[in-house]
């Protein structure tokens, strides 16, 4: 019998990977100085904002052995301890342990071609996998509402392409934050991503992703930011994430990290980014067909609406616990 529902574990795994973030190896004992201001105007231009956010391009590799993961939507699951290794653009590996399972844990990763999640089910391990391009083409029917590679960028290493910004440009919100909406084309239609940015130091604090039918499919809240002058980036040490699958309840997770190592992998394993050869395995693209049939009885989704206007009154979304 499975100890945890596999779909929930899969989504929990991708959330855990997504919120890895990055920074130099550092202890949390001393309170770091606040990020320095970089804007000398109330509302910077799109180009200035993009330059500030895209400072994360300086991070090519990162590792941590001090992550703690709390699956908020699955209170029966204890906190996980995890190690994570990431190399631009799509290579990552995360191993997380469940104390109550006596060493049996989660193994998930990605390379340029595919991503995978190996999870414990009963006395054996089960591998779920997919090719990036095939999975991205079926996001409207997939078990996970976002591609894991998008999650890594959105939560840990955000980027802003000035050419994708909607006609509203940079909006100064009444709560003091800056807001930017980008249009993200995909085989499943055009998604909309909303960023909330700290107005002085120019780092992302909130991200919202809307499907072509304007459903909210993912959001994140990053906090405990620190500035690292050696790489000139501002990085969060705590992130909360929530996903909204097409069927099933929302999935929420929080991750806290004490220390990071940037631009160096804390592993000498030559197979670090190679998918395991687990015998029991399932293709997530094929499983998406089953998910599609499960949601086939829902009311028809109306055609995609035009890009909505910005509003400085926009809600930040329901707070996670």
Residue ranges of predicted features:
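Non-transmembrane domains of secretory- and envelope-associated proteins
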Residues: 23-37, 174-176, 211-321
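An acidic-aromatic
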Residues: 24-26, 90-150, 284-285
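Bacterial N-terminal signal peptides that target proteins for export
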Residues: 1-11
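Short helix-loop boundary/capping segments
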Residues: 186-218
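Flexible, processing/modification-adjacent segments and terminal tails
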Residues: 46, 120-194
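Bacterial N-terminal signal peptides
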Residues: 9-20
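N-terminal leader/targeting segments and the immediate start of mature chains
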Residues: 22-78, 85, 139-145, 162, ...
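Extended beta-sheet lipid-handling architectures
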Residues: 62-66, 77-79, 89, 96, ...
């Amino acid at each position: 019998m499975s100890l945890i529902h596999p779909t929930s574990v899969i989504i929990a795994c991708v959330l855990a990977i997504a919120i890895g973030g990055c920074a130099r190896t550092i202890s949390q004992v001393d309170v770091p100085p606040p990020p320095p201001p970089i804007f000398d105007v109330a509302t910077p231009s799109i180009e200035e904002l993009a330059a500030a956010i895209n400072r994360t391009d300086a991070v090519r590799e990162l590792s941590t052995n001090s992550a703690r993961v709390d699956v908020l939507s699955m209170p029966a699951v204890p906190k996980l301890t995890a190690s994570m290794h990431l190399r631009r653009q799509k290579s990552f590996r995360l191993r997380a342990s469940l104390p109550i399972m006596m060493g049996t844990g989660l193994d998930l990763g990605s390379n340029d071609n595919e991503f995978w999640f190996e999870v414990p089910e009963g006395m054996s391990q089960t591998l779920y996998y997919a090719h990036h391009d095939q999975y991205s083409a079926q996001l409207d029917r997939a078990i996970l509402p976002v591609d894991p590679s998008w999650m890594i960028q959105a939560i840990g290493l955000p980027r802003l392409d000035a050419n994708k910004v909607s006609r509203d440009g940079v909006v100064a919100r009444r709560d003091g934050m800056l807001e930017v909406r980008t249009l993200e084309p995909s085989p499943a239609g055009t998604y909309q991503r909303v960023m909330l940015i700290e107005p002085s130091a120019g780092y992302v604090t909130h991200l919202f992703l809307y499907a072509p039918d304007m459903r909210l499919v993912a959001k994140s809240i990053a906090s405990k930011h620190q500035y690292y002058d050696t790489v000139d980036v501002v990085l969060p040490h705590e992130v909360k994430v929530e996903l909204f699958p097409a069927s099933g309840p929302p999935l929420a997770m929080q991750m806290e990290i004490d220390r990071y190592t940037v631009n160096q992998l804390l592993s000498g394993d030559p197979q670090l980014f190679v998918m395991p050869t687990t015998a029991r395995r399932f293709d997530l693209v094929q499983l998406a067909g089953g998910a599609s049939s499960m949601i086939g009885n829902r009311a028809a989704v109306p055609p995609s609406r035009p890009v909505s206007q910005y509003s400085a009154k926009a809600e930040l979304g329901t707070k996670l616990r």
